[in-house]
Design a protein with these regions (language model features):
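N-terminal accessory targeting/assembly segments
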Residues: 1-59
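Canonical P-loop GTPase G-domain recognition
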Residues: 84-119
Length: 119
């Protein structure tokens, strides 16, 4: 499919109108939100998938992604994997840290695919 107007830049998630006869995009509806990395638009939720260990949770990457999501009013779901590789105490300390520092601003789902926990 081609874009009729060179000034239109279509990205994943865009709602478009197109001419079926000419097989071209004729317009792009106003985006409700969009992210630069990855380039997406009209996002209802964003799921962030991080492991708690191996590799360890990268708080800097997480904060950058969270800030981008909040700037665009996109609700966040955080999935924490590999919880079977840490003790219950370590997991609880980590979850308490997230909840206290981020004031319960997103949903957290701890999972373990190895032990079939949270799936």
């Amino acid at each position: 499919m081609k874009i009729k107007n060179d000034k239109l830049n279509c990205i994943i998630g865009d709602v478009v109108e197109f001419d079926e006869n000419e097989k071209v995009i004729t317009s792009i509806e106003k985006r409700k939100n969009f992210l630069y990395r990855p380039l997406l638009s009209n996002i209802d939720y964003i799921g962030m998938f991080f492991s708690i260990t191996q590799p360890s949770f990268d708080i800097i990457v997480f904060q950058k992604m969270l800030l981008n999501s909040f700037e665009q009013n996109i609700p966040v779901i955080l999935i924490i994997s590999k919880i079977d590789l840490v003790s219950n105490e370590e997991l609880n300390v980590f979850l308490k840290y997230l909840n206290s520092n981020f004031k319960n601003t997103f949903s957290i789902f701890p999972i373990s695919s190895e032990k079939n926990i949270g799936l």
